[in-house]
Amino acid sequence: MADQLTEEQIAEFKEAFSLFDKDGDGTITTKELGTVMRSLGQNPTEAELQDMINEVDADGNGTIDFPEFLTMMAKKMKDTDSEEEIREAFRVFDKDGNGYISAAELRHVMTNLGEKLTDEEVDEMIREADIDGDGQVNYEEFVQMMTAK
């Protein structure tokens, strides 16, 4: 799994790993994971942190080492860039199926997700993704937005 990563990606993940590994001992504990999650505005319980560690902790020693971290990141990357998932997400937004996401369609979906956005905010989201400037988002633009690093 991790052997499909580029050297650049591995270097980036090493940097991320170091942010988690506060004491620099080469492993991430539940305490260190909790610190980082809270700094990102999350509020995980001790049990949730333990579950997260257990999911990744291949050797069962209760902490995450760098190879385990790499495997997790490689899995996540494989999962997120799935062409089919992006196509499905596009279909959710493109209510009338015309191949474009309009401001009205975007507002509708965001409202259903519980996000009350102003017209300005919706227009801004469209503008950010709208590469050709036609005022709506086509599939190519949507893919660009979803896969932008």
UniProtKB/Swiss-Prot annotation:
Domain EF-hand: 8-43, 44-79, 81-116, 117-149
Gene Ontology cellular component annotations, sorted alphabetically: myosin II complex
Signal peptide (UniProt feature, chain positions): none
Superkingdom of source: Eukaryota
Single GO term (MF): calcium ion binding
Protein residues bound to Ca(2+) 1: D21, D23, D25, T27, E32
Residues modified to N-acetylalanine: A2
Positions annotated to bind Ca(2+) 3: D94, D96, N98, Y100, E105
Keyword tags: Acetylation, Calcium, Metal-binding, Methylation, Repeat
Binding site for Ca(2+) 4: D130, D132, D134, Q136, E141
Residues bearing the modification N6,N6,N6-trimethyllysine: K116
Binding site for Ca(2+) 2: D57, D59, N61, T63, E68
Function: Calmodulin acts as part of a calcium signal transduction pathway by mediating the control of a large number of enzymes, ion channels, aquaporins and other proteins through calcium-binding. Calcium-binding is required for the activation of calmodulin. Among the enzymes to be stimulated by the calmodulin-calcium complex are a number of protein kinases, such as myosin light-chain kinases and calmodulin-dependent protein kinase type II (CaMK2), and phosphatases.
Any further remark recorded for this protein: This protein has four functional calcium-binding sites.
UniProt family annotation: Belongs to the calmodulin family.
UniProt protein name: Calmodulin
Species per Swiss-Prot/TrEMBL record: Electrophorus electricus (Electric eel)
Gene: calm
